[in-house]
């Protein structure tokens, strides 16, 4: 047996076959429950429209994170047998500004060399197809791409008629707190949250932002769920916001904190931009924190740019919340 129950003594070799069969049977029954739930809604297409599959995934992710944060579920190197000092990891440093300028140049060259008349004709055909519902839209989109119409132009040709989809942001509550139960860090975070609310006359308000082309939002949703269960008022920004859009939403919602979730290495470009946008709007008092996959080599630069706190992988939600609340209470 290793450590505190990482390898239990309940199962021996002769029982392992039954144990695996039992787990397999459990998975099959739970999967069937999900299938029946979807069927009752009229199939997967209907279920997706209601947002049920996405919500179930987010609930499972929140439970999992809560068990990890509380130590109930142990992961070697994360919350059990952690190294006293992490070895530095060499990473490929990419100059985002240079990449952006290079891509803009390529696009300019592409547009200068393409047949604009052919592009306009192809895009007009797409708009007409969407309007009349006559013809093969996919075929027309492929033809437009062949004459070098961009994906944005093709989608704009459709948007003229049908508009653009706007995601409905739904959140869950109570899932994270039901799993962490009496975790000391979680309880401490709730106490600080109550202290802030008493001092300011309202709950601390945080906006979780996904900026640029970072489409990974499950971690951000889990963090939002955890903060809400601690006592924060939480606003969730849509995917692919620009720093300007996120700053505007933060000001309109009068938040105390903007939490930038970064999983696509855009933090050195996007975090300074949102801080600058908040300054333009006269709201330098809104603090900006950063969470996600942030190399330690980038921490100093982010702090110089104005980030108030940085939370890397493996940071328990309650630990991050305590740090945020301590910053807010110190102001």
Q: What is the predicted role of each segment?
A:
Residues 9-10, 30-126, 151-206:
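Intrinsic disorder at enzyme termini
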Residues 41, 48-50, 60, 78-84, ...:
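Generic beta-strand/beta-sheet core signal
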Residues 220-329:
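Cofactor-cradling patches in redox/metallo enzymes
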Residues 1-8, 13:
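Single conserved hydrophobic/aromatic residue that forms the stacking wall/gate
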Residues 20-21, 45-46, 55-56, 85-87, ...:
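Flexible loop/turn segments at secondary-structure boundaries
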Residues 20, 25-32:
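Conserved phosphate-binding loops in nucleotide/dinucleotide-binding enzymes
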Residues 130-131, 135, 141-151:
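C-terminal substrate/ligand-recognition segments
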